């Protein structure tokens, strides 16, 4: 497994497994929304009203709708989306 995918795969798998809604921003600025149905080395299948095959080289950013816990090499990590952090900051 390539070093670059050692974080990518567990993260995408957690999003898929927990059915967390995501916004995927493409390098051309287009925003796609849905749930990750499946992924491999080159593509992500994104499901909303239809399934879309999105090539990873076209993706700029993946933003989950809520925080996600993923396991990378035995260490658990929790990542919060910026939108969730902004709401939490305002509540304090």
From Swiss-Prot:
What GO cellular component term, any one, is given? cytosol
Q: Which Gene Ontology MF annotations are present?
A: RNA binding
Task: From the UniProt entry, list the residue stretches annotated as the region Disordered.
Answer: 69-92
Superkingdom of origin organism: Bacteria
Biased region (Polar residues) positions are 69-82
UniProt name for this protein? RNA-binding protein Hfq
| Keywords associated with the record | RNA-binding, Stress response
**PANTHER family (alphabetical):** RNA-BINDING PROTEIN HFQ (PTHR34772:SF1)
Q: What GO biological process term is on the record, naming one?
A: regulation of RNA stability
Determine if Transit peptide is one of this entry's keywords. no
Q: Which family does it belong to?
A: Belongs to the Hfq family.
Q: Which organism is it from?
A: Actinobacillus pleuropneumoniae serotype 3 (strain JL03)
Cited function: RNA chaperone that binds small regulatory RNA (sRNAs) and mRNAs to facilitate mRNA translational regulation in response to envelope stress, environmental stress and changes in metabolite concentrations. Also binds with high specificity to tRNAs.
Q: Subunit comment for this entry? A: Homohexamer.
Q: Which residues form the Sm domain?
A: 9-68
